[in-house]
């Protein structure tokens, strides 16, 4: 009998570690806590003390750019360059890396190098981009840790544009690679590629998605669901680009500028194309879409299914795309791969496109249905014609839109690295004034804390206001947070979750403390309202801990500044408004998504782990920080006292819980013996006793010997959120 045979039956085992039916298979609606623990050090091959920003400083940036410029025309036999130039190919790679960003939740984008992993590495819209990254591998190998894949892909796109005649706006490094697929990103619910279950009856795209079909970056180039309707396509383009925070001018500039370069590939039927990288045979070594038609590359390449270039000279920045778009009438045809596209009629010789491999052959320019949307849409058309008349404006606006496209998910400009960071700041970067004054000292902090204590503001007012200011932070695109004190500005000051009337009273009191301090001290020392708001939270927590019998000091680091309304794009910040905030037991309305799932989503955006989320919920409840002073989940008889009462009473078997509403959104807890009503709760509260993982964590904080641990862990998690946007101190 061999080791891997059953001693009874003698049969070979098929099982390996991690295989078999999973908990998710048995209980598909199970709460997904895994997204709170992705990207741990256990999956990271770099050492714990690895600092990418410090490594980037060692990079010979100009030498790297020279190598990238040389690569553009260094055609390889295994994947020859169209027109002898990889530039257009690399622009597509960079665009498709950054273009997955969506403003709704800040997820996607190019900041983590996600194109290397599933599902993006195998999306139909990313066909053959695996080869682009392989072409880059020798350069990545050469420069190693000094340049991340995420930075390299975007910089390569920049170099491609520059090598073909466009002056770019610049480049900011600082994108840190991850080492595994990201489970937190909702790409849609479809089970098949190019499935379309995401548009409602009114044709509005499901939030937060920014692509019309599964596996596409934006839209179907053939038209909506493959229907060659230019106006319908323009509708899709407008909606998807808006979901990426682009306006109509930026959209036209990006489409027209991007399609100035390169060609589409549809030499033959897609049936010749093998599986995507994730499903490819092991001997292909991570490459996918093996093409058995002809040579499998060059003129025989099969990609999107469309075939041809948009204009003559596809490797030079010219006005050819817009000239061709408006100069000719277009006829609907099908490519050799069977895809709908449009060919120009009666083309002048000067506008014919030389073949990508054989210079003796020429082809008519082609357009996608989406391209024709720029010509026939009543909003896009005048914008496009204006660019046609103003080449310099077109080049400038494309460069600006490209910079925004490739940097939108990086957060504030303080995170940008390298010698090509533009001096100009942009409103979409959520600018914050630089510190130009001396910061307050420990003595000053003590003085201000006493003023806050004497102000008459309650513990819950102080803590809730600090939370409201800081908890807008999103780890996805590094937006939001307490720095800037934008809680006092539109739109945040009028968000329902912030209880505007109460917020205004608190802010006015804190503002007076700030003004009194600044007027008393010399002009070279100041304190910002942003700092005082967070310091107020520290005061509240310290007082609540003192009431529980613990003298603790909540860490505080000054250095925040106050942004102005002019520096704040109201429309852009509106997307940060919480639809639900489980930490304040707030839900704007009833949603299809369960409140506990919304809590996990928000915790992930806040970069919290499951234990951090749990301890914060327990602390916020006993500190009485619920929206509108709701008693749901306030499982304590001593509110504003920092105790572990939430966990102790949640896990008390003397309480019986019963739904209070038909939808099981709210619950009542009764004494098991007397039937007396003890507590009320929401789903967010009860999930910490219902879910086995969260209950296990809750049990830790309910233990008699962990009362102080609860306080220390709460302060640690609290401080993490208060400083989430303080990139300069990390």
Curated annotation (Swiss-Prot):
Q: Which domain of life is it from?
A: Bacteria
Where is the stretch described as Disordered?
A: 1-21
Q: Where does heme b bind?
A: 259
Pfam families reported for this sequence? peroxidase
CDD domains for the chain: catalase_peroxidase_1, catalase_peroxidase_2
The UniProt note on the cofactor reads as follows:
Binds 1 heme b (iron(II)-protoporphyrin IX) group per dimer.
Q: Where is this cross-link: Tryptophyl-tyrosyl-methioninium (Trp-Tyr) (with M-244)?
A: 95-218
Q: Where is this site: Transition state stabilizer?
A: 92
What catalytic reaction does the record list?
A: H2O2 + AH2 = A + 2 H2O; 2 H2O2 = O2 + 2 H2O
Query: What Gene Ontology molecular-function terms does this entry list?
Result: catalase activity; heme binding; metal ion binding
Q: Which prosthetic group or cofactor does it need? A: heme b
Carries keyword Metal-binding? yes
- One Gene Ontology cellular component annotation held by this UniProt entry: cytosol
* Post-translational modification note: Formation of the three residue Trp-Tyr-Met cross-link is important for the catalase, but not the peroxidase activity of the enzyme.
Covalent cross-link Tryptophyl-tyrosyl-methioninium (Tyr-Met) (with W-95) as placed by the record, residue numbers = 218-244
What Enzyme Commission number does this protein have? 1.11.1.21
Record keyword Heme present = yes
Q: Name one GO biological process term.
A: hydrogen peroxide catabolic process
Q: Which residues form the active site?
A: 96 (proton acceptor)
What protein family is recorded? Answer: Belongs to the peroxidase family. Peroxidase/catalase subfamily.
Q: Which HAMAP family match?
A: Catal_peroxid
Q: Which NCBIfam families does the record cross-reference, listed alphabetically?
A: cat_per_HPI, PRK15061.1
Q: What does this protein do?
A: Bifunctional enzyme with both catalase and broad-spectrum peroxidase activity.
> What is the protein named?
Catalase-peroxidase
């Amino acid at each position: 009998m061999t080791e891997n045979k059953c001693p009874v039956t003698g049969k070979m085992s098929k099982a390996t570690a991690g295989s078999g039916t999973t908990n998710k298979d048995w209980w598909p609606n199970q709460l997904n806590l895994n997204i709170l623990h992705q990207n741990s050090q256990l999956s990271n091959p770099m050492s714990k003390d690895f600092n990418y920003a410090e490594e980037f400083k060692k990079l010979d940036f100009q030498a790297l750019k020279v190598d990238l410029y040389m690569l553009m025309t260094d055609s390889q036999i295994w994947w020859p360059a169209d027109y002898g130039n990889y530039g257009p190919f690399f622009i597509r790679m960079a665009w498709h890396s950054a273009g997955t960003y969506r403003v709704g939740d800040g997820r996607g984008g190019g900041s983590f190098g996600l194109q290397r992993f599933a599902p993006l590495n195998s999306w139909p819209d990313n066909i053959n981009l695996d080869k682009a990254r392989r072409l880059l591998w020798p350069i990545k190998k050469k420069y190693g840790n000094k340049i991340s894949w995420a930075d390299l892909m975007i910089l390569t796109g920049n170099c491609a544009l520059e090598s073909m005649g466009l002056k770019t706006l610049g480049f900011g490094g600082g994108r840190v690679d991850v080492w595994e697929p990201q489970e937190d990103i909702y790409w849609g619910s479809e089970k098949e590629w190019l499935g379309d279950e995401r548009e409602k009856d009114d044709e509005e795209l499901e939030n937060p998605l920014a692509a019309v079909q599964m596996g596409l970056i934006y839209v179907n180039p053939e038209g909506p669901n493959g229907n060659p309707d230019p106006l319908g396509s323009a509708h899709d383009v407008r909606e998807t680009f808006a979901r990426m925070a682009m306006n109509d001018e930026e959209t036209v500039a990006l489409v027209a500028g991007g399609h100035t370069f390169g060609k589409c590939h549809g030499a033959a039927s897609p049936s010749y194309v093998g599986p995507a990288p994730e499903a490819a045979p092991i001997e292909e070594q991570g490459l996918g879409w093996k093409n058995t038609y002809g040579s499998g590359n060059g003129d025989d390449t099969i990609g999107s299914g469309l075939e041809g270039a948009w204009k003559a000279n596809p490797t030079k920045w010219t006005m050819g795309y817009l000239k061709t778009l408006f100069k000719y009438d277009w006829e609907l045809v099908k490519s050799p791969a069977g895809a709908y596209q449009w060919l120009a009629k009666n083309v002048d010789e000067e506008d014919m496109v030389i073949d990508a491999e054989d210079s003796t052959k020429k082809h008519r320019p082609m357009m996608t249905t989406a391209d024709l949307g720029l010509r026939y849409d009543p909003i896009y058309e005048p914008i496009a014609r204006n660019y046609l008349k103003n080449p310099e404006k077109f080049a400038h606006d494309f460069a600006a839109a490209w910079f925004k496209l490739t940097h939108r998910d990086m957060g504030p400009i303080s995170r940008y690295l390298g010698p090509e960071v533009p001096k100009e700041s942009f409103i979409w970067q959520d600018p914050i004034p630089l510190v130009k004054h001396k910061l307050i000292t420990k003595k000053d902090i003590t003085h201000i804390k006493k003023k806050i204590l004497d102000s008459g503001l309650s513990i819950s007012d102080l803590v809730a206001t600090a939370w409201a200011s800081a908890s807008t932070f999103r780890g996805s695109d590094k937006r939001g947070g307490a720095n800037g004190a934008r809680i006092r500005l539109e739109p945040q000051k009028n968000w329902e979750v912030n209880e505007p009337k109460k917020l205004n009273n608190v802010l006015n009191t804190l503002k007076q403390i700030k003004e009194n301090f600044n007027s008393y001290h010399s002009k070279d020392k100041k304190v910002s309202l942003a700092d005082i708001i967070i310091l107020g939270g520290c005061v509240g927590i310290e007082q609540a801990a003192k009431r529980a019998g613990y003298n603790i000091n909540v860490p505080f680091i000054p250095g925040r500044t106050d942004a102005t309304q002019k520096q704040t794009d109201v429309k852009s910040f509106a997307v940060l408004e919480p639809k639900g905030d489980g930490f304040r037991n707030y839900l704007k309305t009833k949603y299809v998504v369960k409140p506990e799932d919304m809590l996990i989503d928000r915790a992930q955006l806040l970069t919290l782990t499951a234990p951090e989320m749990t301890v914060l919920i327990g602390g916020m409840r006993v500190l009485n920080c619920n929206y509108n002073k709701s008693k749901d989940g306030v499982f304590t008889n001593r509110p504003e006292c920092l105790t572990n009462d939430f966990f102790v009473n949640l896990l008390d078997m003397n309480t019986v819980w019963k739904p209070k509403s038909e939808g099981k959104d709210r619950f009542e807890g009764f004494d098991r013996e007397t039937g007396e009503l003890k507590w009320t709760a929401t789903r967010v509260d009860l999930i910490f006793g219902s879910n086995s993982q969260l209950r296990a964590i809750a049990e830790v904080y309910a233990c008699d010997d962990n009362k102080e641990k609860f306080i220390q862990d709460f302060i640690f998690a609290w401080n993490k959120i208060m400083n989430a946007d303080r990139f300069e101190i990390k």
